[in-house]
Amino acid sequence: MLKNFILVTLRNLRRNTLYSVINISGLSIGIACSILILLWVQDETSFDKSIPKVNKIHQVWVNAHFDNSIQSWNSVPLPTYTEMKGAHAKIVNSVVTGWGGARLIALDDQRIMKDGYFASKEFLDVFEFPMLVGDRSTVLDDPSSIVISEELAKVLFKDEDPGGKFLKVDDTSTLQVTGIFKDIPDNSSFQFDYLIPWQHRVATEQWVRNNTTNWGNYSFQVFLELNGDADQLEVEESIKGMLMEKGQDDIERIFFLH
């Protein structure tokens, strides 16, 4: 019976070649599009899901009111980082980071460009990226430390234990490896192969030191971890006027959480 069905199908295909090609092509395109849409939806819904507390973490943004328009920025003044810690009882922690970028990482005669971040010591506690070596709560405590990815550790150290070894960054800073984290998934907002303590940046970059208490320079990223039962709108209400209180210009600028 199956053989007869196949023979009949083949005869119909030969008899109506053009019609069959159109139908088969349409079906193939439809299936391909459905698979692509399914993969896209799967990627979108799984984005940042590797971060255990993703629903509790919010980035601080600014709405700036100019005449008849509102501009939204995800860059904020540096003192936002410290001021947020006591701004509301439901704010568990705050984190400040740079914007990332490639730097030259060197070990002896090995030199490689890798992307990474300057990040405050709370970063790994808040985002909870899995650690292979080191305690996430302390690996960024020392300003002269560096935490690297599993991949970067393998590239530079092969099978050797990198713990306590030193790396040269941009031919200017010598930093000690204090931890190794698992490679970051592709569907993560953060993509990096190393973390350098924020205090190292403060110590080595004059312009960062100059902006520690400056509310007029919007050059930094700040993230907040909220308590599990926190009402985001309630927290926003308590912090939205901070810029107007601290700033010195007449432009209305309001904090909100994204």
Predicted regions located by residue number:
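Membrane-helix entry/capping segments
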Residues: 1-11, 15-19, 51-52, 236-258
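Structural preference for long, well-ordered alpha-helical segments in enzyme cores
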Residues: 9, 24, 28, 40, ...
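Generic structural signal for small/hydrophobic residues in well-ordered secondary structure
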Residues: 13-16, 23, 44, 60, ...
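Short, strongly hydrophobic transmembrane alpha-helices
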Residues: 16-43
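Membrane-proximal extracellular/periplasmic loop immediately following the first transmembrane helix
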Residues: 37-102, 210-211, 215-227, 234-238, ...
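Extracytoplasmic
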Residues: 55-57, 89, 111, 141-145, ...
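Short acidic/polar micro-motifs at solvent-exposed secondary-structure junctions
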Residues: 62-73, 96-122, 132-146, 170-172, ...
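Mid-to-C-terminal secondary-structure elements
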Residues: 120-133, 146-258
